[in-house]
Amino acid sequence: MILQALTAYYEQLLKQGKVEAPGWDSKFKVSYELRLGPDGQLLALNDLRQEVPKGKKTVIAPRELPVPHRVKRASGVAANFLCDNTSYLLGADEKGKPERSRQCFEACAALHHKVLDGVDSPAAKAILAFFDSWNPAAASTHPLLAEQWADLNNNANLVFGYESPDGAHWLATTDDAIRAAWQSAFDTSDADAETARCLITGKEAGIARIHPAIKGVMGAQAAGAALVSFNAPAFCSYGHEQGANAPVSEYAAFAYTTALNLLLADRNCCQRIGDTTIVCWAENAAPAYSNAMLMFFCGGSEARGVSESDLAAALKALSQGRPVSFLDDKLDPNQNFYVLGISPNAARLSVRFFLHSSFGQFAKNLQDHADRLSITRPAFDKRENLSVWALAQETVNQRSRDKNPSPQLVGDLLRAILTGGPYPATLLNGVTLRIRAEREVTRGRAAILKAYYLRNYPTELNKEVFTVSLNESSNVPYVLGRLFSVLETIQSVANPGINATIKDRYFNSACATPATAFPTLVKLAQKHLQKMSTPNEVHFSKQLTELMAQLPETGFPARLSLPEQGAFEIGYYHQTQKRYAKKNEEE
């Protein structure tokens, strides 16, 4: 299903003229042009690199150009057509292995003769003449190369160019005769390959022995990683080798890898969260869909010129099945949409999840998630929404050396949000541990508690307790949380400037075993009330009386279950935020 969806995406891009035909890589980083004359002599070395913004500064980066399809190299010698590094095009490098460099150059020359022999093109003849006359031993001292030799050997890719006698010049990759010759060679390259019925297209075709590499996944090898590979006998069946174990045609292998590489290269289509790289796309290949989706669950809309209010309005409309205009495009809630999560695993990629639904259904799931997370927030917290990464960070000790949340948690949380499924138990466990360790109920942690119990245990009682702001529920654990917040306030007012409050010593015991903590705290509060001015004493005494009246006659509960502790923590958070809100209004 993944490969079929990616192949269909490639074919849609091909119809729209946004990608090259099979046999060509649409975007490949090229640093220099080797410009040749009619006799194959090197006329110039042209720097193709350009200035590109990177963060707040500008850097020099290679230019992305369409080039003939690249071979996947392991450890052997394998030449590319028209575009390669110095080892292949010049027969020299700084790796200290001149014999291997010579073999690379000879392999490259043989490939170009195989493709271009007999081609009626001045550029083709110039390239062949270059290979026939070039002296690799003199490459590093060539007057046109010596000054840039260090840069040329710093992982730079070079491409052939041609200059005619009248001064006109062009890249060999744009020469019509050369392109036609390469296309013919590529189309017949699998003539000797093993044939089988392709699992993606359903057609009999030559099977790809090794699939092209996937590049752009953070944490994977720089040379690329494989989504489909068989590198040990244990993975093979019925005597098949390599790609024959899962027959995918050369065309389909090229199509799905081209599509995925393009998505990974587009920051509007992919996002890294933890060790998971998320890639998303619409069936019609309109970029506005993936752009909007990443804004919905990763944030960052302001940087892309979309206000959070406009983003929220678009999400709500789509969740209700209404089309909206977004980024100069119209988003249709019925459009098929795909979300793929992949993680690096040495030379391979692991699929964390693959989801397919209508764009409107994804929007509804995200809207429901946002509604469950909604909770009153402190005045200093300006965030309208909490991103997936922000939620995962609430489970991490920010004082530890490793501040990254569990990769498994991030993947499970993403899946739950996008599918509308139950939140992972590890999310609740992580938040509960942090609250117990730090005795701090932050906005993020309170929002997670609220969302978790409303989604995983949608009882009427939970709907009554886990609300956006303070409510008058008589639920005992919730009332106890509010009571603890009031007791903490009484202590702070009676003893202004104290370094530690009852929260630091009693929060965990009051939350888990109220009967052991609250009698002591209530007695302590009576002493604190005696230190206050009359208006404050009357105000807080009234609050205490109202809350104590909602507790059972049997007294404080001996212990609270985990869900009841969640209600306690939400009650504490609500009451504390009410206090801060009132203080801000007075100021």
PLM segments and residue spans:
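Short metal-coordination and nucleic-acid-contact micro-motifs, chiefly zinc-binding Cys/His arrays
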Residues: 190-196
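Short Cys/His-rich metal-coordination motifs, predominantly Zn2+-binding knuckles/fingers
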Residues: 201-204
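Short, solvent-exposed secondary-structure capping/transition elements
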Residues: 207-211, 268-269
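Short microdomains enriched in Cys/His and/or Lys/Arg
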Residues: 209-245
